[in-house]
Amino acid sequence: MKRVFSGVQPSGDIHIGNYLGAMRQFVALQDDYDCFFCVVDLHALTVPQDPVELKKNTIELAALYMAIGLDPKKVTLFVQSHVSAHAELAWLLQCITYFGELSRMTQFKEKSKGKESVSVGLFTYPDLMAADILLYKTHYVPVGEDQKQHLELTRDVAQRFNNRFGETFVIPEPMILKFGARIMSLTNPTKKMSKSDADPNNRVNLLDDPDTIYRKIMKAVTDSESEIRLDWEKKPGISNLLTIYSLFTGMEVDEVVNKFKGQGYGTLKKELAEVVIDKLSVIQKNYRDISEEEVLRVLKEGAERAEAVAVETLKEVKEKMGLILRD
């Protein structure tokens, strides 16, 4: 069975962009692939984190993984820092990665822009991501457009290692959704919906209450026209709302356009809010039914399964690089 790896950072509230762009896809994959899904807490540390919030967010994210429909009996669900091989392999990969390669990473340029100081961890983040993927000899990685460049680096580093030390790593392939992989901000639909945005109205969080969901969607930025159509260049706000409606209902976007043809933006927003509230209510009920003890048990078992695979890969890498193994 082909293997899939992906992860989400526990660095803030999980929103519908995370869900529609990645997490929902995870559920569809669990029956056909050997799936490793990770709460990547080490990645979160590349920017300052409140320790109490980080712990809370880690538990919350793991519970949401389960609440959206991931079955711990079918997938390996674990926390990145619980498997130390991630950090160790990241260092080994840094030693064969070139400074220029990391300097060209668009995400580093964006996140470090205008800041007086940034962490080395933010700069070397792509090597930790590469380690996450390569440790499990992953075949496919569900990634958004913003991570595509990092996956290309992962492939380059893996191929370089294989050429230099002998066949070791599987060269992973991206699994990118052609439609809906990038959900945009409700307040600025030219930017991606983000949990790091200072304006909480830019996103609908999975655990938002119905009144908050309704308010955020009704306030979503649109345009001065009145025609409902998909046009990302001229009507990014409406196009974003149509996309969200399509993904939550399973309707083709053309069907959604026809459904609301001749109607006002307010009608689209109102019905979209009702759809989102209805869909998220199921996730929220599942979330409330999961205890912290159950989450910790699942994470412990997942880490044990992940570590069993990771240590074998790390051992192989060390041997090929000439490191002496401890008995």
From Swiss-Prot:
Its EC number is 6.1.1.2. It comes from Caldanaerobacter subterraneus subsp. tengcongensis (strain DSM 15242 / JCM 11007 / NBRC 100824 / MB4) (Thermoanaerobacter tengcongensis). GO terms for molecular function: ATP binding; tryptophan-tRNA ligase activity. L-tryptophan binds at D132. One of its GO terms (biological process) is tryptophanyl-tRNA aminoacylation. Belongs to the class-I aminoacyl-tRNA synthetase family. ATP binds at Q9, P10, S11, G17, N18, G144, E145, D146, I183, K192, M193, S194, K195, S196. PROSITE patterns: AA_TRNA_LIGASE_I (PS00178). One of its GO terms (cellular component) is cytosol. Keywords: Aminoacyl-tRNA synthetase, ATP-binding, Cytoplasm, Ligase, Nucleotide-binding, Protein biosynthesis. Homodimer. A motif ('HIGH' region) lies at residues 10-18. This is Tryptophan--tRNA ligase. PANTHER family: TRYPTOPHAN--TRNA LIGASE, MITOCHONDRIAL. It catalyses: tRNA(Trp) + L-tryptophan + ATP = L-tryptophyl-tRNA(Trp) + AMP + diphosphate + H(+).
